[in-house]
């Protein structure tokens, strides 16, 4: 029995995601990508065997693959059940099927909100209700062979994420990460930041000639920035605030929190504080914590640091 389990574990996993248009397949795919799946949207079923051949070549990034297939490719979709049955019978990879659905009323509501055309009604010749009914009837067979059926009628996005995480994060992989970035306001704000802190009120090493060409990574600059009382008070408050906020962000289903610390040029003060913050957060949590000094190299000439 142990031998059989090892054989199963060694196989790559293929998850086919299909279901009703507007039920949330794209969101499911995003959540699976966060769990380490290699995701492909709208692959014609006839290409599934070719994709499995790629998976069998041993590429580590293709150990877990999720492929969304739906009625957008109507002429190809009819072969989906046949292709899935064939792959399952060959037993080359683990093949699962997820079917995502929602009630007619909820689907109608979502289409009205997005103002998008249903894939079976792109010419506007039929009612939305008729298009939904035809699609549901067309998907009866593929639904019958699904391992997982998820009804998103009453699910909020974070609840759907939690359900996907429960089903497919089998190894309890920690998917939450924290990225701490230093930047200079004169070079533009960090666009992807969730939280931005302005430290231009702190004493500036730029005006100390010996420190000017260095960065906050250098010990001389780091010690200069940290020696001031206002820096110590600010940093203690910042760390307390973040330790209060971070669990809440994770609970809400975020997979990455980007914290940006900015000073004038992004070379001295923000770098020193980002460096310390990343170190302290790394000690406090089991999450992956990264530090990135975006602008430190621009005026100092040092290489941009990512860790």
Curated annotation (Swiss-Prot):
Keywords: ATP-binding, GTP-binding, Nucleotide-binding. The keyword ATP-binding applies. GTP binds at residues 70-73. Transmembrane segments: none annotated. SUPFAM superfamilies: P-loop containing nucleoside triphosphate hydrolases (SSF52540). Coiled coil: none annotated. GO terms for molecular function: ATP binding; GTP binding. ATP binds at residues 19-26. Belongs to the RapZ-like family. Displays ATPase and GTPase activities. NCBIfam families: PRK05416.1. This is Nucleotide-binding protein Sca_0414. It comes from Staphylococcus carnosus (strain TM300).
